[in-house]
Amino acid sequence: MPKEVITQRSVDYNQWYLDIVREADLAEVAEVVRGCIVVKAHGWAIWELMQRALDDRIKATGHANVQFPLLIPKSFIMKEAEHVEGFAPEVAEVTRAGGEELAEPYIIRPTSETIIGYFYSKWIRSYRDLPLLYNQWANVMRWEMRTRPFLRTAEFWWQEGHTAHATEAEAEEETLRILHDVYADFVEKEMAVPVIRGLKTEKEKFPGALRSYCIEAMMQDGRALQAGTSHNLGQNFARAFDITFTDQNNTIQYAWTTSWGVSTRLIGALIMTHSDDEGLVLPPRLAPIQVVVVPIYKNDEERSLVMAAVEQMTAAWKGRLRFKVDDRDNYSPGYKFNEWELKGVPVRIEVGPKDVAKETVALARRDIPGKAGKSFVPQAGLTERIEALLNEMQTALFQRALAFREAHTADVTSYDELKEQIERGFARAYWAGDTADEKRIQEETRATIRCIPLEQPGSVGRCVYTGRETDRQVIFARAY
């Protein structure tokens, strides 16, 4: 498998990304269906590991999984003014079925606040029915004009949580719990991607939300990627769909609702945070194959010797490590090394007749390519050594990504400095502007306010655009 298939990041970052998606066998563009992709086995296996880790966290916070219809009556979408305005350009409609025009068109689910709101209005009657904490794993469709595998596609896969509460304080607590205890915790611990937790501006918040919170990550080209969002919807959807309950004083009240979601774009974040010019790099916790063993032999006698040693060695791994023994005879060891390196397998073990005689193996770690990442280690205690190494690699990938973000984030005090810094990464600045100011900056620089970080310096400075005094800092960046 020749290395020339991967464009170097320094030559064309976008093509490098597309090459990895293709050559690491993660996905393929579905050219017969506009804007869609086929997620291949290796890519879906990564998503399944993500799902498992997220689902455990979602259930640990008291939520249950449900499934709502894919098709939503168009009238539902029209009920919430901000919501319909925000999603109108992206919706796909079904107008015919069974050979006839439908009396009312259906919208193919872009998100489910409206149809879930309808059913919540039927299910909630009393304060005793609250909180209602549900999540669903689903595919959605948004008619995106410019698509890129995983990062922005017409159809994608996600989880969307939808909850209803008796008070605004409870809804706000839920919104922040999901942001911190589920999303940020998952992305940092499982994906090894550092994130900034923040509040979206009025311009950037979810259509129809009271407040939108987010986690933002930096990719290797300095751009931001929104890795997850958690929305306090206030009573907007409750009023639109008449989600009411009788409180403890026998008074009818509107519920307070939330929604939150992450999607398969996290696979794109994983690629662009950790991968290199050799191919995909995966954090061990999300690697479908954590260890690949490549037996090396020249004849049947050596094969029997080496495979017996491999079988004995890997017997202790079952239930502890996700591993694969690549004993294909129609590919050379060099081809196999390149293939598994390209697919991002964290650890490669090579075993030949000499290794069997010495009771050693050659061990190569994916996060350090070439000779620097290769060593010869004893077979005794190998299982524990690999487990420790995988933990070390998980931490090292996070620390490397964090160091990169810090090196490419700078405080700016003038608009000229801001324009210069967004060419390199994140610009942190004091901000007292309004939505019109944000729009002008975006038109002039293609940068947006990614978030208002929840951690603020507690000091006062002058707005980078208006010059007014403020104690609020924001993060500007170009984004995916």
Swiss-Prot record:
Superkingdom of origin organism: Bacteria
Key words of the record: Aminoacyl-tRNA synthetase, ATP-binding, Cytoplasm, Ligase, Nucleotide-binding, Protein biosynthesis
Reactions mediated catalytically: tRNA(Pro) + L-proline + ATP = L-prolyl-tRNA(Pro) + AMP + diphosphate
A biological process term (GO) from this entry: prolyl-tRNA aminoacylation
Coarse class of the protein's main subcellular location: cytoplasm
Keyword Transferase: no
E.C. no: 6.1.1.15
Keyword ATP-binding (UniProt): yes
SMART domains (alphabetical): ProRS-C_1
Matching CDD domains: ProRS_anticodon_zinc, ProRS_core_arch_euk
Gene Ontology CC, one term: cytoplasm
Subcellular location: Cytoplasm
A molecular function GO annotation: proline-tRNA ligase activity
InterPro entries per the UniProt record, alphabetical: aa-tRNA-synt_IIb, aa-tRNA-synth_II, aa-tRNA-synth_II/BPL/LPL, Anticodon-bd, Anticodon-bd_dom_sf, Pro-tRNA-ligase_IIa, Pro-tRNA-ligase_IIa_arc-type, Pro-tRNA_ligase_II_C
Free-text function comment from the UniProt entry: Catalyzes the attachment of proline to tRNA(Pro) in a two-step reaction: proline is first activated by ATP to form Pro-AMP and then transferred to the acceptor end of tRNA(Pro).
Domain-related comment: Consists of three domains: the N-terminal catalytic domain, the anticodon-binding domain and the C-terminal extension.
Quaternary structure (record): Homodimer.
PANTHER family: BIFUNCTIONAL GLUTAMATE_PROLINE--TRNA LIGASE (PTHR43382:SF2), PROLYL-TRNA SYNTHETASE (PTHR43382)
Record-stated family: Belongs to the class-II aminoacyl-tRNA synthetase family. ProS type 3 subfamily.
Protein name according to UniProt: Proline--tRNA ligase
